Amino acid sequence: MQRDGLQAYFKGGTALYKALKTTRRFSEDIDLSVDTRGCSTAQNNKRLERATKRYEALPRDPSQSVTHRSEVISVYNYVPVTAYDADDALQRFGKLKIEATSFTISEPTESLEVSALIYDLADEDQRRILKSEYGVAPFQVQTITLERIFIDKLFAAEAYVRKSDIEHRAFEAAKHIYDLAVMREHPKIVQLMQDAAQMEKLLNIRMTEEMERHDGIPGVLPREFTFFTDAAHKPEVRKAYDTMQRQYVLREQDRIEFAAAALALDRISEQLSANEAWQKCKMPLVSLDDRAPATYSESKTGHEKRGMSKSRKRNPER
């Protein structure tokens, strides 16, 4: 779809673990951020449906589709090639969910090489067979950057920990806490937490996006985040974390004890507190709808913005 010009970008947990070249936490749902700025309602809906319902490699189950104003979810079925528990209550196997949202701001992005796990684990001879006989090979996908995913997870963890007494919120918080603990020592994240300019750009994007979220924390500034310490003192979060690891962190060596994860949050908090942009971040002056459509030229050192006038509309969807 990206090759055909669809402005949809890979994000979320599955994108994270594809970027890290590991499957430490089981995640195969595909989350997409779809850029619909400057689009009419009809064009918005068309882009979301195109991002979720137009794939032909797997059969789609229309009965499981969900459509909201700025979100479309589709579920595709497949037959796993390995043995699995057919009564698995979590339905982790045999179904692939694709979720596309347009309330998110699709920037910054980068090209990510993605490959199937079977390819990653194969030796050179096996890879040649996979390529020549089965067409299994790495490919490029436009993806929300690792640094932006990290910022998103900070905000998500704060929102879910604050509401951890509500059903399912503690479990969602647990997944983000685990991911943050995994990401903390990645070189790109270490650099981000020391880079005030990059931090400021990402926080401005996320704070603007937060204004549009129905289940977010639009009135909370980054320096007011409390989940770094609160998570360790909420029994429902601790319980959910242990459950999440049993269900989604399939290898024992990939599991992180809750105390170690809490310590990782403390270290993240200390590093963020030393970042001027984190401390001085302010509420955005415009909402997502006020932002003009834009294209971005990516580089290792920054993202050059080339704005378009708000009065100019995008071409109608073809």
Describe each PLM feature range.
Residues 289-304:
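Long, low-complexity intrinsically disordered regions
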